[in-house]
From Swiss-Prot:
PROSITE patterns: ABC_TRANSPORTER_1, ABC_TRANSPORTER_2, RBSA. Pfam families: ABC_tran. The lineage of its organism: Bacteria, Pseudomonadati, Pseudomonadota, Alphaproteobacteria, Rhodobacterales. It comes from the Bacteria. This is Ribose import ATP-binding protein RbsA. Part of the ABC transporter complex RbsABC involved in ribose import. Responsible for energy coupling to the transport system. Its main location: membrane. Keywords: ATP-binding, Cell inner membrane, Cell membrane, Membrane, Nucleotide-binding, Repeat, Sugar transport, Translocase, Transport. It is found in: Cell inner membrane.
Length: 516
């Protein structure tokens, strides 16, 4: 039984009651309630499409709620613009910070509300001094006069936080703030959040990562399908409780049970090399097998997959499909030979965001949906429906544009697109990156189903639990070379990290030749 949080001694600085927001054909928010308290972090948790982004836009004045009430310090407010929300002390720091590279740090901090002197002109010296004061207060190692374009992602996040403090925000919304940060930068962000709490600010922290939520949050609120389904103290719940609230059912295993049997060899790569990305890569892949690839950023994993798929050409090496030598010089040749690739960047490389779902799914399979040179709309819909239903795609209709889907559902569309070609080998590059835990479970279950049907799967992942939970074998890459090839029985987090970080030796040429 999940416990509800006791009423705190302080009243909430922000309270939402019965908030409703409807778009054509979709009820994005259905009588949602939420409370944020001073000096506390509330984690907002939910699957993609649960309504988190919509509630943020309502809170920041981008959307107007169709019904319900918002109060600040107990007084009803009506936000008709972002300026109204800012004036009420509410500001948001988004996953992709909205800043201007051509302006200085100070100009970005005070854009829209710069101090002004005589004749209404911007008082530049005062603006720089105030900006530097805020930066120093949050221990940001930045100068207010520095051009923003000279900063990295982590420091741009600090500028966004400084901008929130420049309007004396009492409520700070952080939407997936760690998505592009290193572990060191994440720890520094945690320290900054602790300081904001100590100043009495209320923080709404949106994250898919449970380790972050349990590290930083005092309270939680869970949304599911546009409804508020639970809230309470973090101290009273565990990960399983939150998952159950998110998906509406108990999820005992994010990684499905498999028998790990494998069939005949489907793919063999020998001596693949690239002038700058990888060297002397050899591997085999069998029907029904999930081969995991693990490594640190820059290890060459994605570059190797792009070469196998024909996006880039190797400088050396051979490839065999089912024992026969093949030439893979382009993605078209790879597809002809039964190899497909789901890229890490689904938005830029995997999906056409401006096209509807059914056209995305059927794009590489037009021979199945046309007759006499003419496309058959019914055949397109039937093919798209078959694969999207198997992947439990959540969408209003198959003619909905992919760009309007959540990240997890976009990923399902890309996977469906390539499965519709009936491949022998599917390469999944970071298949669950940036998607919620419910969508992850669905993708994992479908991967297991594909392997059970005899499809050969290569899974590139930077998530150790995913590597451990899904792989039959794992190849660890380091600096463009194979550092280790490990059977399932030999896998552990320590072993993976040791080989990826270079604590263990790389595989030598004679060891490569000993592989079956």
């Amino acid at each position: 039984m999940l416990k509800l949080a006791p009423t705190p001694s302080d009243d909430p600085v922000l309270r939402l009651t019965g908030i409703t927001k409807t778009f054509p054909g979709v009820k994005a928010l259905n009588a949602v309630s939420l409370e944020l308290y001073p000096g506390e972090v509330t984690a907002l948790i939910g699957e993609n499409g649960a309504g988190k982004s919509t509630i943020v836009k309502v809170l920041t004045g981008i959307y107007r709620a169709d019904g319900g009430e918002i109060t600040v310090d107990g007084e009803p407010v009506n936000f008709t613009s972002a300026e109204d929300a800012t004036a009420a002390g509410i500001t948001a720091i988004h996953q992709e910070t909205v800043l201007f590279d051509e302006l200085s740090v100070a100009e970005n901090i005070f854009i829209g509300h710069a101090p002004r002197g005589r004749f209404g002109l911007i008082d530049t010296s005062t603006m720089i001094a105030r900006a530097q004061e805020i930066l120093d207060r949050i221990d940001a190692p930045l100068r207010a006069t520095t051009p923003l374009k000279d900063l990295g992602i982590a420091n741009k996040h600090l500028v966004a936080i400084a901008r929130a403090l420049s309007v004396d925000a009492r409520v700070v919304i952080m939407d997936e703030p760690t998505a592009a940060l290193s572990q060191k930068e994440i720890e520094e962000l945690y320290e900054l959040v602790d300081r904001l709490k100590a100043e009495g600010r209320a923080i709404l922290f949106i994250s898919h990562k449970f380790d972050e939520v349990f590290r930083i949050a005092d309270r939680y609120a869970v949304f599911r399908d546009g409804e508020h389904v639970g809230a309470g103290l973090m101290a009273d719940v565990n990960e399983g409780d939150l998952v159950q609230l998110m998906v509406g059912r108990a999820v005992d295993q994010i990684f499905p049970e498999r028998d790990h049997a494998k069939g005949a060899e489907v793919l063999r790569v020998e001596g693949y090399a690239h002038p700058t990305e990888f060297d002397d890569i050899s591997l085999t892949l069998h029907a029904g097998e999930i081969l995991g690839f693990y490594g640190l950023v820059g290890a060459g994993r994605s570059e190797l997959m792009q070469a196998i798929f024909g996006i880039t050409k190797p400088s050396a090496g051979t490839i065999q499909i089912a024992g026969e030598a093949r030439t893979i010089g382009s993605p078209a040749q790879a597809i002809e030979n039964g190899i497909v690739y789901v890229p890490e960047d689904r938005g830029q490389q995997g999906a056409v965001l401006g096209l509807p779902i059914f056209q995305n799914v059927t794009l590489p399979s037009l021979s199945q949906t046309s007759r006499g040179g003419f496309l058959k709309l019914a055949a397109e819909f039937a093919l798209a429906r078959d694969y999207t239903e198997r992947l439990e795609l959540r969408a209003a209709a198959l003619d909905q544009d992919v760009g309007n889907l959540s990240g997890g559902n976009q990923q399902k569309v890309v996977i469906a697109k390539w499965l519709a070609t009936k491949p022998r080998v599917i390469i999944l590059d970071e298949p669950t990156k940036g998607i919620d835990i419910g969508s992850k479970a669905a993708v994992h279950a479908f991967m297991a189903e594909l392997a059970a049907e005899g499809l050969a799967v290569i899974m590139v992942s930077s998530e150790i639990p995913e590597i451990l939970g899904m792989s039959d074998r794992v190849i660890v890459m380091r600096e463009g070379l194979i550092a280790a090839e490990l059977d399932r029985a030999d896998l552990s987090p320590e072993v993976l990290v040791r080989h990826a970080a270079g604590i263990g030796p790389k595989v030598h040429e004679n060891e490569m030749e000993e592989r079956p």
